[in-house]
Regions:
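Short beta-strand scaffold segments in enzyme catalytic cores
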Residues: 83-95, 115, 408-412, 482-484, ...
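Extended C-terminal subregions enriched in glycine
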Residues: 474, 508-509, 517-565
């Protein structure tokens, strides 16, 4: 069968829904948003060209893994504020054991990782390619002599850069589960960097806003601005020849180029010149471990998500278990009676996240207890039906368990129902702002995700504990939450995730609640207004779109309400039952996001 790919920005189009029952006004209004259908595979990503790259790889006979890796490398070119070679991330995947494309001779050349688990007619596994602290890093790295945290050093200095994991992770998953040669998968990203692409309105505005940060570094200034120092305007061509050379080297030599070869040498040279901590030994020692996904039932479905050092997956499952018995359908979508217990559960869950979670390779965590039904019941009992419990009140309680902006997410479904949820990050937008001379990629500032000082907020306002202290080789706690959902019979339903720092977890939570509890279609589930609360600061961040009455009722319960700009970018895909194709949604909150579909040729 001949197939072709076409790209289309996800538009929030009104749906007539003729003859369809409308259970209530809110749900009827929400269903105006419709996902993009595909009779084949689909890719939803934060940038349209990168999504189109993934769809083109599906057309070439690639599976969901091939498409996800191709899109991720393309994002390193077209979305430099978040896509990267110099950062890290997580992914969760599921592939069927048999099918037209999801399995192939290339993918069968190695045994399944022992960490994989059987789900339905396939297997699922997670990959941890989070950055690691250099061996020279210690717990006092970002402290001033008076004990205060040096925020500039934690966010912008070479010491804020952790050992990157993106290249190792993407190559490892493609080698194990992909069907196409690496050179084929990486070719589109190389072409985008070498030949250039027209800058869109979002990237043009982003680069202009980041000009003070990027122009402080000579290499970044040359890479992202014109010769006269002006930012690129929409429609102007941005070429990145140094990045193209690095991508070409990786495609030819594999991970060795980045961790031991030409790129490694350039990175270590920069570290020595500027007082950074990463050494050649740190790079050569980097590994991306396979992990068993966290799993829990929810409303007749099974949710699979990322284990620590993602703090997102465990926090998400804890929230789902606390909220599952509540009759949220009866209280209604986005009502104060629904949002209040959600906020209180968020605060309790973030309290546990910040105190208890860390890198499982170095700290002991009470995960089994944290995710148990009995603990969820205890947490529910602590939620008052009509009163907000202030953060200071919760923080003063002893723990019931013992301690032991910019990111990007893409989701892919292939024709066999194979799913990949992949999230990568530099931490804040453009990371440190510094690029590696001769290599063309930005450095992350992930060391700020560690606890610089217990109780001191990081860039996202999270007050974390000793479990997440800086230590050599340790991976910082993250909020990235790539997530898959399966129907009760084990067939795949959807893949989702989001950027957004500490707001990632609550974004994914609300997409799942909107889809699985309130019955919205995937586009409506993604488009609905979002809320966020994380214990500190003691407030609810709320997007525009909730009714004034809802805000007033929340305030009457004791909540401090803060209207905030759009949160997250939950690019998601859904697999239709019985091989009927897939659906894709690019979050309308981010200009330039796209769902790109694969269809049979007419």
């Amino acid at each position: 069968m001949r197939i072709h790919a076409f790209a289309a920005l996800l538009l929030t189009l009104p749906a007539a829904a003729q003859g369809a029952p409308a259970p209530n006004l809110l749900q009827e209004q929400a269903q105006r948003f419709q996902p993009i259908p595909s009779s084949g595979g689909i890719v939803a990503a934060q940038e349209a060209r990168a999504a189109a790259v993934g769809a083109a790889v599906l057309r070439r006979g690639g599976n969901a893994v091939d498409a996800a890796v191709a899109s991720a490398f393309a994002l390193a070119v077209t979305l430099p504020q978040a896509g990267n070679l110099g950062g890290g991330g997580f992914l969760v995947l599921w592939l069927p054991r048999s099918g037209r494309i999801s399995t192939c001779p290339a993918a069968a050349r190695a045994a399944s990782p022992p960490e994989s688990i059987a789900i339905g007619r396939g297997e699922a596994v997670a990959l941890n390619f989070r950055e690691t602290a250099p061996q020279a890093a210690g717990p006092d790295l970002f402290l001033n002599p008076d004990g205060s945290v040096n925020r500039e050093r934690a966010l912008r200095s070479p010491m804020s850069t952790a050992v990157p994991g993106s290249v190792a992770g993407l190559l490892q998953v493609q080698e194990r589960y992909g069907c196409l040669p690496l050179a084929t998968v990486m070719a589109p990203a190389i072409a985008l960097a070498e030949q250039g692409f027209p800058v869109g309105a979002e990237l043009s505005a982003s680069l202009a806003a980041a000009a003070p940060l990027l122009k402080a570094d000579p290499t970044s200034a040359r890479q992202f601005f014109k010769a006269d120092g002006r930012p690129y305007r929409p429609g102007e061509l941005l070429r990145q020849p140094q990045l193209a050379a690095s991508l070409r080297c990786i495609a030819r030599e594999g991970a060795g180029c980045f961790y031991r070869g030409r790129v490694a040498q350039a990175l270590v040279r920069l570290m020595r010149q500027r007082g950074g901590l990463i050494t050649a030994a740190d790079l050569a020692a980097y590994r991306a471990p396979w992990m068993t996904p966290l799993s829990a039932p929810f409303r007749g479905h099974r949710v699979l998500t990322m284990p620590p050092p993602s703090g997102g997956g465990a926090t998400l499952l804890q929230l789902l278990q606390v909220l599952e018995p509540l009759d949220l359908e009866a209280t209604g979508l986005n009502s104060a009676a629904t949002l209040h217990p959600m906020v209180e559960a968020m605060n309790l869950a973030y309290r546990d996240r910040n105190r208890l979670l860390g890198d499982p390779a170095q700290v002991v965590m009470p995960l089994e207890r944290l995710l148990s039904g009995s603990y969820a019941a205890q947490q529910r009992q602590r939620i008052s039906a009509d009163r907000h419990r202030p953060a200071a009140e919760l923080e003063a309680e002893p723990s019931r368990l013992s301690e032991g902006t910019n990111t990007t997410h893409l989701s892919v479904a292939d024709r066999d129902g194979g799913l990949v949820a992949l999230t990568t990050t530099l931490n804040t937008a453009y990371g440190t702002g510094s690029s590696v001379p001769g290599a063309g990629f930005l450095l992350n500032n992930e060391m700020d995700d560690f606890t610089a000082k217990p109780g001191a907020p990081n860039a996202y306002g999270l007050r974390q504990g000793q479990q997440n202290a800086i230590a050599p080789g340790r991976r910082p706690l993250s909020s990235m939450t790539p997530t898959l959902v399966f129907r009760g019979d084990g067939t795949p339903l959807l893949a989702t995730g989001s950027p957004g720092g500490s707001r990632i977890i609550t974004t994914v939570l609300q997409v799942l609640l909107n889809r699985l509890v309130h019955g919205l279609n995937l586009a409506s589930a993604v488009a609905e207004p979002r809320i966020h609360s994380q214990l500190w600061p003691d407030q609810i961040s709320i997007e525009q779109g909730l009714s004034p009455d809802t805000l007033r009722l929340l305030q009457q319960r004791g909540h401090r309400v803060l209207l905030t700009p759009a949160m997250g970018s939950a690019n998601s895909v859904e697999v239709l039952p019985e091989g009927r194709g897939s659906l894709g949604v690019a979050d309308p909150r981010r200009l330039g996001a796209a769902a790109v579909v694969e269809l049979p040729w007419p």
